[in-house]
């Protein structure tokens, strides 16, 4: 799905915060380890406020996509990589994103989650 590739490209180019705020639906949800669900664009913006994301990069590669027969919902899953610039620490894992077509025809995610600890080489 082009939206997911564009999402990752924006994260790499302009930072994770900008990418997530650009691609989350207004009522989208993010599930992360050891955290309550982040519900909606406004809550995500409040979490990101005053927290720079220039110290690390997050990118991902979708390996599968499916759009439902109605053309308004779809999902992607794949592998992600993170890199902490100061320490050189890397991470990788898997993710799934559920997408909804918006009234303007664009795709925004309504649910995003991932798990860590899976080396990219074990695809």
Region locations from a protein language model:
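Short, low-complexity N-terminal intrinsically disordered segments enriched in polar/charged residues
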Residues: 1-22, 121-123
């Amino acid at each position: 799905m082009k939206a997911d590739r564009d999402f990752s490209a924006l994260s790499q180019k302009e930072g994770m915060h900008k990418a997530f705020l650009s691609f989350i639906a207004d009522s989208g949800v993010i599930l992360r380890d050891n955290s309550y669900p982040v519900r909606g664009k406004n809550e995500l913006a409040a979490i990101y406020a005053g927290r720079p994301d220039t110290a690390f990069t997050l990118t991902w590669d979708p390996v599968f996509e499916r759009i439902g027969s109605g053309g308004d919902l779809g999902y992607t899953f794949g592998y992600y990589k993170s890199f902490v610039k100061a320490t050189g620490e890397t991470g990788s894992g898997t993710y799934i994103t559920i997408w909804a077509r918006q009234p303007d025809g664009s795709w925004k995610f309504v649910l995003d989650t991932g798990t860590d600890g899976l080396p990219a080489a074990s695809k």
